[in-house]
Amino acid sequence: FPENIFRNVSVPGKDVEHIIKDSRVAAVTITGSTPVGRSVAKVAGQYLKKTVLELGGSDPYIILEDADIDKAVNACINGRILNAGQSCISAKRIIATKFVYHSILDRFKEILPKKIMGDPRDNVDIGPMVSLSARDEVHMQVTNSIDSGASLILGGFIPKLKGAFYPITLLAGVKPGMVAFDEEIFGPVLSLIMAENEEEAIALANNTPFGLGAAIFTKDIEKGEIIAKTRIHAG
């Protein structure tokens, strides 16, 4: 680009309003948490600036009875540990029908311990989180969920490593009312949820204030597309 066409300015939160209200700023876009998005939208609305918000998500990955278990499990793992789980559309809530729930849990227990955590410059599967405070927030959410009745299957501790590392964590038996279900966990935590059937799986997927992304695993492509387009409140 020619000089001064595009400029990246890093500022603390207290200076955001000063920038947004400047007459030279025509529009505002933000990718971040819901609380930050709310505050930016408030300021942008006050000064009548066009606004695009891409905020948090608690993305459901629904695994139906006829799904290919291995493909579904691998997709969930890859979709969750990418960038140490710090992706807005990562696989945050894994909702499996009762018929396949235990098979999926067994596959997670088999595969996840083999994943290597370490320096991302090395041949590893997962690196550190963005900051110690972000890591501590995730750990607090995990601990809170366990205290509420979720079963800790893997991970869930702060490792003795230099840096903001958090291990791949698997929670099972997650239910509405638990932090792992109700909130966005922005880190490498897989929350496994059991649904009695397809209808309950869809209801659980939609039982959230978030609506960023979702995925459905089934061998029936036509049914999957119908559910995705007409019944899942995301996207």
Predicted regions and their residues:
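Short hydrophobic/charged patches on amphipathic alpha-helices used for structural packing
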Residues: 16-20, 73, 199-202
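Conserved C-terminal structural/oligomerization subdomain of aldehyde/semialdehyde dehydrogenase
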Residues: 25, 62, 158, 165-235
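Short glycine-enriched loop/turn motifs at secondary-structure junctions
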Residues: 22, 55-56, 87-89, 122-123, ...
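Structural motif
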Residues: 9-11, 31, 215-217
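PLP-dependent aminotransferase-like
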Residues: 1-16
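Short helix-initiation/N-cap motifs at beta->coil->alpha
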Residues: 12-15, 57, 196-198
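ALDH superfamily catalytic-core signature
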Residues: 27, 33-175
